[in-house]
Regions:
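C-terminal amphipathic alpha-helical segment
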Residues: 295-340
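Acidic/polar-rich alpha-helix caps and helix-coil junctions
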Residues: 22-67, 102-291, 341-531
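Short alpha-helical hairpin
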Residues: 75-101, 356-373
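Sec-dependent bacterial lipoprotein signal peptides
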Residues: 1-20
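Acidic side chains
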Residues: 72-74, 189, 305, 322, ...
Length: 531
C-alpha cells in the first residue's frame, strides 16, 4: 500500500511519501513547486531560512501546544476549554480523542504541521545551497548553520511531544524517496545529530545574524554555538517517558554540553503588536491575565504551605477540592505581610488574587496568580520573552550530579541560587540527597535535595518554554495518574496514510501515566504528600 501526503504549510509544499509495503512506486509530484523559480534569488533563499526559525517558534510557543501542555502538567490552571486546556486537565484524566473532527485536533496538528513546515523550509534552503542553485557568497555558512539549527530544534520537539515522527533532511528525495514513521528515540537521535552539525558550522566560522532572524538581537556564531549546546542538554534530559529512562540519560554528556552552553538568559524580543504579534508566546501573554485566564495550580505552589491547607486539599477527592489561602513560606508567593484589608501582599513573582471566576470543576480553582511576565502584557508584547533561563542550566547540572554521584555540597550551592535568593529559604546545605521518587518540597523539615530540585525547577521556570514542566514531570514520574505521556500522530495524517487511528491517556489505559505511591496505599505523610 502506498500513499501520497500533501499539506499546505505556507511555504514551498512538502510532499511526503509514506512506505507501507514493498511495492514499486510510481509517483507524480503535482504539488511541489519549481524550487528554482520559488528560490530564484539569494534574497528568496535567505528569507526562507530566516523564516524557518519563526515557524519553529510559532509552532511551539503559540497557544497550542504551549498553553495546552501547561494544564496537564498541573502548573497552571484555567477555566477555558480553548487549546484543549480543559480536556487535558480533567480529573480523573481522560483518554485523548484523536480524530480529524475532534476539538482537540489543533493541539496536535498545530505543532506537527508547523514543525514539519519549519523543517521543510530549512531543508529546502540547505538543498539549494549545497546543489549550487543559489549562492549567498560569504553568508553561505551562516545560512547552512542556521538551517541545521532549525532542523534539529524542530525534530527535537517532535520527539518530545509525539510517540513517533518522520525524519526529513536534505538527503531525502521527496519526489522519489521514502519516509517512514519511526520511534521518538530515533527522531531525537536525528535531532541531536543535526544540532551537532550546526555547532560544527558555528565553531568553524565567525559571523553575526541580522537582528530579525531571532527577533531583537544580532546573535554571533559563538553565541549560537552556546545556545545549541544548551538545547542538546535540555532535549536529552526531557526526552524520557518515565523515571527509569530519566535515570539512564547520558548525564555525563549533558554536563559536557552544559559546560559549552549558555552563559546568559536567552530568548526573543516581542514585536509590540500584542496578541497579534508574530513573536508571541501564549503563557507569557496570558499568565498575568488571571481573572479570566491562567492562575497558578496548587499542585505547583502547595508544597510551600506551612499550614494544613494543602495537605487537607490533597486528602479530598478531586470533586471536593476548592480554593483556599495558603500560609506559604516562599517569598516568591507572599512577602510575609498583610495589607490593610488582610490580603497577603504580593511575593516577587506571584500574588493572592480574588475568588476564581472559572466555570469548571472546583479542583481547578486557585487564589494565586503568576505576574512574573506581566510586562509582556502591559507593554503590548514589546519586551524580552525569556525562553531559556540560566537557572535551567544550574538545575540540569544539579540533576546530572545527582545521577552521577556528584558532590552534594555543589548540588546544594546550585539549588540555593533560587531557593535562598528568590524563595527566601535557608540553605539546602546538609540536606540528604534523597531520590527521584521524592515529591517536590521546599520545607527543610521534610525536604531532600531531590525534593528541593523538583520544587525549585518548576517554580523558577514556570511558563518559560512550551511544555517544559510537562516533560520534566513525565521523566520524574510526577504526572497525575492517567495523563498521556506523549501524543499520537494527528488523525489527519493517519487517515491520509490509511493507518489505524490510535491514542493515549486515561487512567489505566495505554500511554497514561502510572499510579504514584500515594495512590497505592502508602501513608501520605510518609510520602511527603506526593500528589
Amino acid at each position: 500500500m502506498k500513499k501520497l501526503i500533501t499539506h499546505s504549510l505556507g511555504i514551498p509544499l512538502i510532499v511526503v511519501t509514506i512506505f507501507l509495503g514493498c511495492q514499486d512506486m510510481d509517483i507524480v509530484n503535482q504539488n511541489q513547486p519549481d524550487e528554482q523559480r520559488a528560490l530564484a534569488s539569494p534574497g528568496d533563499l535567505e528569507s526562507l531560512i530566516k523564516g524557518s526559525f519563526l515557524s519553529w517558534f510559532d509552532a511551539i510557543q503559540s497557544s497550542t501546544p504551549n498553553m495546552s501542555l501547561a494544564m496537564p502538567s498541573d502548573t497552571y490552571t484555567c477555566g477555558w476549554g480553548n487549546f484543549g486546556m480543559g480536556s487535558l486537565s480533567t480529573e480523573p484524566r481522560e483518554i485523548l480523542i484523536n480524530t480529524s473532527s475532534s476539538g482537540l485536533r489543533g493541539v496536535m496538528e498545530g505543532p506537527w504541521f508547523g514543525l514539519y513546515g519549519a523543517i521543510s523550509a530549512a531543508t529546502d534552503g540547505i538543498r539549494n545551497i549545497e546543489a549550487g542553485n543559489v549562492t549567498l557568497g560569504d553568508d553561505n555558512e551562516r545560512a547552512l548553520g542556521f538551517a541545521k539549527l532549525v532542523q534539529g530544534l524542530s525534530h527535537g520537539y517532535i520527539a518530545l511531544m509525539f510517540d513517533k515522527g518522520f525524519i526529513l533532511d536534505e538527503n531525502v528525495d521527496l519526489a522519489s524517496g521514502i519516509l517512514e514513521l519511526v520511534p521518538y528515540t530515533d527522531v531525537m537521535d536525528a535531532a541531536i545529530a543535526q544540532l551537532e552539525a550546526a555547532i560544527a558550522i558555528f565553531n568553524a566560522n565567525d559571523f553575526t545574524l541580522p537582528n530579525d532572524w531571532i527577533n531583537g538581537k544580532a546573535f554571533t556564531s559563538a553565541e549560537l554555538s552556546k545556545l545549541t549546546h544548551s538545547f542538546i542538554a535540555r532535549y536529552m534530559a526531557l526526552l524520557p517517558r518515565d523515571k527509569t529512562q530519566r535515570a539512564a540519560v547520558n548525564w555525563s554528556s549533558v554536563l559536557t554540553h552544559l559546560d559549552a552552553g549558555l552563559t546568559e538568559d536567552w530568548g526573543v524580543i516581542g514585536d509590540g503588536a500584542g496578541r497579534s504579534s508574530v513573536w508571541y508566546s501564549g503563557t507569557h501573554w496570558y499568565s498575568s491575565q488571571w481573572n479570566v485566564w491562567q492562575r497558578v495550580d496548587y499542585k505547583l505552589i502547595g508544597p510551600s504551605d506551612k499550614s494544613t491547607g494543602y495537605s487537607d486539599w490533597l486528602g479530598k477527592a478531586p470533586a471536593d477540592r476548592d480554593e483556599f489561602i495558603m500560609d506559604s513560606g516562599d517569598s516568591r508567593i507572599w512577602d510575609g505581610t498583610l495589607s490593610a484589608d488582610g490580603t497577603q501582599n504580593p511575593g516577587s513573582q506571584m500574588l493572592q488574587i480574588g475568588q476564581t471566576t472559572f466555570i469548571r470543576a472546583s479542583y481547578g480553582f486557585s487564589r494565586y496568580g503568576h505576574d512574573r511576565f506581566k510586562e509582556v502584557t502591559t507593554s503590548n508584547n514589546a519586551v524580552p520573552i525569556v525562553l531559556f533561563r540560566m537557572s535551567e542550566n544550574d538545575f540540569l547540572r544539579a540533576e546530572a550530579l545527582m545521577h552521577t554521584g556528584g558532590s552534594t555540597s555543589t548540588i546544594a550551592a546550585l539549588l540555593d541560587k533560587t531557593h535562598m535568593g528568590d524563595g527566601g529559604y535557608a540553605s539546602t546545605s546538609g540536606l540528604a540527597l534523597g531520590s527521584i521518587n521524592d515529591a517536590p518540597d521546599p520545607k527543610h523539615d521534610a525536604a531532600t535535595l531531590w525534593s528541593v530540585l523538583k520544587y525549585e525547577k518548576n517554580m523558577d521556570l514556570l511558563g518559560t518554554w512550551s511544555g517544559l514542566q510537562y516533560w520534566e514531570k513525565r521523566g520524574w514520574g510526577d504526572l497525575t495518574t492517567g495523563t498521556l505521556i506523549h501524543f499520537p500522530v494527528p488523525a489527519a495524517d493517519l487517515e491520509t496514510m490509511g493507518l489505524q487511528l490510535y491514542t493515549f491517556g486515561g487512567v489505566g489505559l495505554p500511554g497514561g501515566a502510572p499510579k504514584r505511591r500515594s495512590e497505592i496505599g502508602e501513608d501520605l505523610k510518609e510520602w511527603n504528600l506526593r500528589y
